[in-house]
C-alpha cells in the first residue's frame, strides 16, 4: 500500500498488478455482458418492440373503426336531419290542412245556423200569419153575424145556416 502512495506522490504511474486493479473482474463482467446481454436484452427489446407494434396496430385499427363509426354517424345525422325536415314539412302541411278544414267547417256551421235561424223565423212568421188570419176571420164572422142578425129574419137565417153548414161539410 505504501508503494501506491509513493507512486501517487511521484506522478502518474500505471499499476500493473492485475488482481489489485480488478481488470480480471471487469473482463469477466464485460465478457458476460457481451455473451448474455444480447440474448436477454434482445429478447426484452424484441418483446417490447412487438408490444409497441401491436399497440400501434391496435391504435390504427381503433382509428379505422372510429373513422368508420364517425362516417356512419355523419350519414345517420344527415339522414336524421332529412327525416326531421320532412316531418317538419309534413306537420306544417297537416296543420295548414287542419286549419283550412276547421275554417270550412266553421263557415258551414255558421251557414247552417243562419239557415236554421231563417227557417225558424219563417216558421214563426207563418204561425203568426195564420193566427192573424184566424183572428181576422173570427172578427169578420162576428161582425157579419152581428150585422146579419139585425137584417135577417128567421127564415133567411135558417137558410144561411144551412148553406154555411153545407160549405163547412165540403171542406
From Swiss-Prot:
Primary subcellular site in the record, as a coarse category: membrane
TM segment ranges: 12-34
Domain of life of the native organism: Bacteria
Entries under InterPro entries matching the protein: ATP_synth_b/b'su_bac/chlpt
GO molecular function, one term: proton-transporting ATP synthase activity, rotational mechanism
Membrane topology term: Single-pass membrane protein
Pfam families registered for this protein in UniProt: ATP-synt_B (PF00430)
Keywords: ATP synthesis, CF(0), Hydrogen ion transport, Ion transport, Membrane, Thylakoid, Transmembrane, Transmembrane helix, Transport
Example of a GO cellular component annotation carried by this entry: plasma membrane-derived thylakoid membrane
Location in the cell: Cellular thylakoid membrane
Subunit structure: F-type ATPases have 2 components, F(1) - the catalytic core - and F(0) - the membrane proton channel. F(1) has five subunits: alpha(3), beta(3), gamma(1), delta(1), epsilon(1). F(0) has four main subunits: a(1), b(1), b'(1) and c(10-14). The alpha and beta chains form an alternating ring which encloses part of the gamma chain. F(1) is attached to F(0) by a central stalk formed by the gamma and epsilon chains, while a peripheral stalk is formed by the delta, b and b' chains.
Function: F(1)F(0) ATP synthase produces ATP from ADP in the presence of a proton or sodium gradient. F-type ATPases consist of two structural domains, F(1) containing the extramembraneous catalytic core and F(0) containing the membrane proton channel, linked together by a central stalk and a peripheral stalk. During catalysis, ATP synthesis in the catalytic domain of F(1) is coupled via a rotary mechanism of the central stalk subunits to proton translocation.
Family annotation (NCBIfam families): PRK07352.1 (NF005606)
Family stated for the protein in its record: Belongs to the ATPase B chain family.
Protein name from the UniProt record: ATP synthase subunit b
Amino acid at each position: 500500500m505504501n508503494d501506491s502512495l509513493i507512486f501517487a506522490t511521484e506522478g502518474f504511474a500505471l499499476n500493473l498488478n492485475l488482481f489489485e486493479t480488478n481488470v480480471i473482474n471487469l473482463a469477466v463482467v464485460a465478457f458476460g455482458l457481451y455473451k448474455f446481454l444480447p440474448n436477454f436484452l434482445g429478447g426484452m427489446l424484441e418483446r417490447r418492440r412487438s408490444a409497441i407494434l401491436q399497440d400501434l396496430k391496435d391504435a390504427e385499427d381503433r382509428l379505422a373503426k372510429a373513422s368508420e363509426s364517425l362516417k356512419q354517424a355523419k350519414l345517420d345525422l344527415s339522414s336524421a336531419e332529412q327525416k326531421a325536415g320532412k316531418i317538419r314539412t309534413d306537420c306544417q302541411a297537416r296543420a295548414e290542412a287542419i286549419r283550412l278544414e276547421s275554417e270550412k267547417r266553421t263557415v258551414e256551421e255558421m251557414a247552417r245556423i243562419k239557415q236554421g235561424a231563417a227557417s225558424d223565423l219563417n216558421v214563426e212568421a207563418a204561425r203568426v200569419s195564420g193566427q192573424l188570419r184566424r183572428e181576422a176571420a173570427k172578427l169578420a164572422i162576428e161582425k157579419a153575424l152581428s150585422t146579419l142578425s139585425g137584417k135577417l129574419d128567421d127564415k133567411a137565417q135558417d137558410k144561411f145556416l144551412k148553406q154555411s153548414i153545407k160549405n163547412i161539410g165540403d171542406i
